[in-house]
Amino acid sequence: MKCDKHTMLLYAVTDRAWTGRETLRQQVEDALKGGVTCVQLREKELDDAAFLQEAMELSALCRSYGVPFIINDNVEIAIKCHADGIHVGQEDMAAADVRAKVGPDMIIGVSAHSVEEAQLAVAHGADYLGVGAAFSTHTKTDVDVLPEGRLKEICDSVDAVSYTHLRAHE
């Protein structure tokens, strides 16, 4: 699948802490039925075997809806589950190294917090940027919120699709 403004229109990032009584699969399917255009599986607590199992299941689910499925931070899992893409942060594998490992067809997303990080990521093969955080979030409590105007500066500096963290009630 290709990365464009339409596939990134409503980008859902999973958070097991919010599942409540539903399974993560149920929540992802509800999101897909509700119009989500891209799903990122973000798992920080699962071992690789459990992560791969969940990734395989959600990858198949997203494929059945024609929606890109992205793995957060784990290139090996992304390759093994035939994900449509991989998202890496600044402290993870560099975009150029990811591109060399996954080839030209997998979508690569990179977190960026400055114009310089954004431009470097795009120059090294990123298809989209995760920019932010624009607001404080419950999923990333240690992150600094971007200064006013920074999101626009970053978006204006690159030719790539960008997203930022928005709260559901905003």
Task: Give the location of each predicted region.
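Conserved anion-binding
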Residues: 89-163
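Conserved small/polar residues in nucleotide/adenosyl-binding loops
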Residues: 164-170
